[in-house]
């Protein structure tokens, strides 16, 4: 009798679990299955895009290629800020690099600088909830932290709309924008796994309305003040907890040590010799609501590439396209003689969904006319950049996949500058020298004599399972 009762309880629990799972899945699929088309408004705005103009008040810029430099330049901006710091990031962890950024922000807040931090509401639920390091920052009187679209299982129709932006603004004059999240994979040189990515540092000492730093600041204010952004533990009494006090002390000590080791570079506020002049920098962004989005960034980047004179080179960690996206590439290939893309090989891809979809659809991608180079560097490549002719460079957070096109907020900078274009080309070539060109039929052109990463049996099984069990949901990954 007792055994029968236990079985009945277990069946009820299982039934409840299956009902909840079905509710979540149905809510997500119904909300995000339909993919909006490009509006006439977007087409008109793209035709008259700001990247076609030249700015009278030019901004200076430089690309940040290496992870240690990316950490140092962030700390440098924070340390020298006098009034306000804005940090927006998809993911923020309290590992070594994350603690250094937290320590730098806490130090700035102690100096009276106003800090506003915006983090995606799904990633923050995993990394920030119950974490004394983040409570130590959120409880500071000069700090505000908000979460974009907090995870809410009761509203699955909002679940997949994530904030994928990554940027840091100091005093409304200088900023870093790119594809790096705020933890060890992307910042510093700490033991363990790494991802290779790319940022741009932009400097404008006397910004005017037309400048990209003001475009970015206005974008931030819009997303900060809209209904989907809510506060993260802003109770100042949290600072009295012993665990929080200990965490703050650890942050202060760790940051002070890093600062002393890099004091000369961090305190240098003259960026002239390390940056390049630009003719124009323009910000391209997706809609910021949590539903299925109009593919604004995809369309605008596509139109830019179609107008190239002779060269388009794309770097992306993942390729997951629908027919509309494939058609865009076919049009580019018809117009541009040198059209190529570099992405992670199936074995080198850190994202199992990206690896599985690429393995299945590689021939379809090749049929568009684009040349594919597969990166075999050992660590997953995460850079999201486009090189157009010898004067345009595009860098930011946008992956060449349906998630970036239709689901996430995304930012890309379009930079008109031959110097930046040359710097980007050199950075791209570093990775391309560890890649092979895949040809139709599965053979390779291997001019750099690259040793490919082994595709293990375990990874093959994982890819097989993803393709056959989750392939129907590829628009969500």
Where are these regions (language model features)?
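Charged, low-complexity intrinsically disordered terminal segments
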Residues: 2-143, 153-164, 170, 174-477
